[in-house]
Structures are given as structure tokens and as C-alpha cells.
Amino acid sequence: VSSSIDTADNPFVRVREENNVLLVALTSNRGLCGGFNNNVIKKTKKLVSEYGESSVAVFPVGKKANDAFKNSTYLATDNLPQNSASLWDDLNFENVNSLTEELMSSYKNGDFDKIIVVYNSFKNAAVQIIKSEQLLPIVKADSDSENTDNTDYIFEPSQEEIIVDLIPNSLKVTFYKAMLDSLASEHGARMTA
């Protein structure tokens, strides 16, 4: 179904030249969890060097990322909340939702051309996998080459109305999942440290 929907006019799908990239680094507020925080910080610094300091901004979520990047020249300070570490104190969808809306607004307004989330993905209590996942622009799913089904779908309400609601909600859930993955990974890393 997703391959039959035209999303070209949606601002969250439109690919732009990558002049300003935002890296959202998810770390914890506390230490004593092995390499959990350090892995995110190292991966973020690697991405900064790949994109170039002049075209990157880092938005830290968590005290450890904030401490690591507070004196850097590429710390994101405009149009984003400054006390993002408090999200971990009461992690719920509503709190993450407001941050995600600000990220989407910054992208939609052209402040950033690409937003990447760097976090630890939970595999099990002993293993956390460092991930850098593109949040915006949305990457269109590859259509299966074997699936050549040319079914004509009828949408109620219209495609445009569905997309206007579906894409922002999908982005909110994707970012919330990254936050939950990071929290579960932190607890696993703390147990095995």
C-alpha cells in the first residue's frame, strides 16, 4: 500500500541538499553503565567528522551527551529546548511528543536538511547495538522487486488527509521507540557493567 501512495508533496519526505544536518545524541543522565554513553558520543563525533563541523549541529538528549558537547562549536542552541535531559526523568509519549514536534518544525522550517538520531538499540541485557537512524527526511521503503501488484486502492479519507496525519504520528512513534530502546539499553548496560 505504501508504494502506491504519492508523498512527493509532503515536506517530511522531500530530500534537500544536506547543508545543515542535526544529530540527536541519546545518552543517559548517569554514568556507571559501561561504554553505553561513550559509544553514542564516539559515533556522534564520527558523524560530525563525516559531515564536517560547519554543516552539523548536535542536539544532546541526556546529561552525558550534554557534558560531552557543551563546549563544542556545533552544539545546537537555536529553536530547540535546552533542558532535554529532563525527558529521562519522566519518559512518556507526551513529553517525547513535544520534542519530536519541535524537531519536525525545525526540519519543516528549513533549519535542518537532515535529522539523524544516534542511540543504543536494545538487543539483550548484555548487548546494545549503536545505531544512527535517519529521522528526517523520511526514507521511502524499497518496494519488493518480486511484488508487482498494481492494485488500485481506494482511500477514505483521501490520500492527502491520511498522509498529513500519518507521517507526523509515524515520526513521533519512531523517535519514542528510539528513546525507549535507549532506556532499555541503559538498564541492560548498567546490569552488566
What does each of the following model-derived ranges do?
Residues 1-193:
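C-terminal beta-strand-loop-alpha-helix "lid" module of Rossmann-like NAD(P)-dependent dehydrogenases
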